[in-house]
Amino acid sequence: MIKGRLNKGTAADMRYYAGIFNGEGRSINNSGKNLMKMVRLQWNPLGRDLKWRQSDVSRHEKPTLSIAAAWAGNRGNCSRWSSSGCGGLDGLGADTTNDNRYDINQAVAEIAYKHQGLSVQSEYHWKNVADDNTGLDHDYEGAYAQAGYFFNEINKSIPEELELAFRYAFVDEPDSTGNMLLQNTRREYTVGANWFIAGHGNKVTLDYSHLTLDDASSNRGFEDDRVRLQWDISF
């Protein structure tokens, strides 16, 4: 893999990544001769690099923006990448008899911004899996947009450890339990609060989500609600 940064500190500041990998996971030999390929380009138009972390815990004094796009492709007997080895999407399981069954192309476009306690980020994902056994193409599409803010930045009576956040996400995917030619749609609406005891290394999260599913095969809609309390410690 190669990576680097160009034009640091200018309006043309950017990072680049390109690599060729084993397409079946870490320490797992390929079943065939094909390798996974990827490229990523990140533009920092304000001349400041933005790390891949959510929430503006460090309170960026200057506005920091990143815009990026990436692509990855692989052909093999697995329909999804897994760090533990060959994986299969629902309805497109790993194939032990055809090493070249799935031709996969996927892309992502993303944007992120941080400034004085405000963090905004969004990603759009697209994936196509061409199945040689059936001659069919299956498309997957999804996106999310989320924002968080430490209101202590405008009201000092609010604890500086508290962040309030909102998230919206959707996924369009083949109906793996019915007709793979039909598309199901899942949506998520989440509001949450984070309490950062010691940055991302020690934090408590409380959130509420409203989840929906539009099932294409049954032509029915389903709804569910979820409340989650999580204490996250990492080191």
State the predicted function of each range.
Residues 7-14, 27-28, 46-65, 152-162, ...:
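Short loop/turn motifs that connect adjacent beta-strands in outer-membrane beta-barrel proteins
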Residues 14-18, 65-69, 109, 120-122, ...:
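Transmembrane beta-strands of outer-membrane beta-barrel proteins
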Residues 20-24, 45, 71-77, 115-117, ...:
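Transmembrane beta-strands of outer-membrane beta-barrel pores
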Residues 24-135:
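Surface-exposed beta-loop-beta
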Residues 33-37, 103-107, 137-143, 185-189, ...:
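Residues that define the transmembrane beta-barrel architecture of outer-membrane proteins
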Residues 37-48, 147, 223-235:
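Outer-membrane beta-barrel "beta-signal"
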Residues 80-88, 148-196, 203-205:
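Outer membrane beta-barrel transmembrane domains
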Residues 102-107, 114-173:
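A beta-strand-loop signature enriched in Asp, Gly, Thr, and Trp
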